[in-house]
Structure formats: structure tokens, C-alpha cells
């Protein structure tokens, strides 16, 4: 769920999901369109695509369990949906960490009307 994803983001990046990733660029937050603005926004685009591959799951509300082993995120065994949601969230949180050096505050609270066009997964 968004709760676990938010914790993963905080643990990986040291930043709170809200406000740092909740409406960043064109893809972080609800929905998305256009070309991602930077590497962090691209993490969100890929995350949206990952969720899009889970049509029978509820990624924003389905809870899952994960732990850390030697600092690494390990998704714990759950239902098929829980496992796949956790893996999507894990990949995004790691992607955010890997791209912290290019995170730009100019894309925080980015206005939706500046995001034009469609990009397919």
C-alpha cells in the first residue's frame, strides 16, 4: 500500500514521500502523461507501468510486509498481489535512491498542465 511504499522511500532516500515524491514531475503522484522530466520522474513512470501490469490488484491499498536484510529490502511472502506490489515499490524506492544526485526541487509540486503528450509503457 501507499503506507509501505512511503516507508521504503524514506528508508532508501532519507526523504518523506510527501512532499518530495507525491507530486514530482509528470509521473510521481496520481496519473501521469508526457515525457518524464528527469531520472526521478522516470522512476515514477516505470513504477506506474509496473502497477499497470497488476490489473487484478489494488496497489495503493493492498498491504504487504517487507524487511531489511543487511540494508536491502526483502519482500516477505504474501499473496501473489502483495508480492508483486512489493516488488514494484521496492524497485521504485531503489531507483529514487540511485537518482538522488539529480533530484531537482523545480519539479516538486510540478503543475499538471505542463505535462503534455502520451508515453506508452
UniProtKB/Swiss-Prot annotation:
Function: PLA2 catalyzes the calcium-dependent hydrolysis of the 2-acyl groups in 3-sn-phosphoglycerides.
EC number(s) from the headed UniProt entry: 3.1.1.4
Keywords, alphabetical: Calcium, Disulfide bond, Hydrolase, Lipid degradation, Lipid metabolism, Metal-binding, Secreted
Disulfide bonds: 26-115, 28-44, 43-95, 49-121, 50-88, 57-81, 75-86
Reaction it catalyzes: a 1,2-diacyl-sn-glycero-3-phosphocholine + H2O = a 1-acyl-sn-glycero-3-phosphocholine + a fatty acid + H(+)
Name of the protein described by the UniProt record: Basic phospholipase A2 3
Entry note: cofactor: Binds 1 Ca(2+) ion.
Gene3D superfamilies in the cross-refs: Phospholipase A2 domain
Subcellular localization: Secreted
SMART domains, per database record: PA2c
Binding-site list for Ca(2+): 27, 29, 31, 48
Amino acid at each position: 500500500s501507499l503506507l509501505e511504499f512511503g516507508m521504503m522511500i524514506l528508508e532508501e532516500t532519507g526523504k518523506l514521500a510527501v512532499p518530495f515524491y507525491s507530486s514530482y514531475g509528470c509521473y510521481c503522484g496520481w496519473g501521469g502523461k508526457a515525457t518524464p522530466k528527469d531520472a526521478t520522474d522516470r522512476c515514477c513512470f516505470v513504477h506506474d507501468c509496473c502497477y499497470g501490469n497488476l490489473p487484478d490488484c489494488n496497489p495503493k491499498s493492498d498491504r504487504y510486509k517487507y524487511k531489511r536484510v543487511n540494508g536491502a529490502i526483502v519482500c516477505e511472502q504474501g499473496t501473489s498481489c502483495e508480492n508483486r506490489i512489493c516488488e514494484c515499490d521496492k524497485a521504485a524506492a531503489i531507483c529514487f535512491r540511485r537518482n538522488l544526485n539529480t533530484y531537482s526541487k523545480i519539479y516538486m509540486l510540478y503543475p499538471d498542465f505542463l505535462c503534455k503528450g502520451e508515453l506508452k509503457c
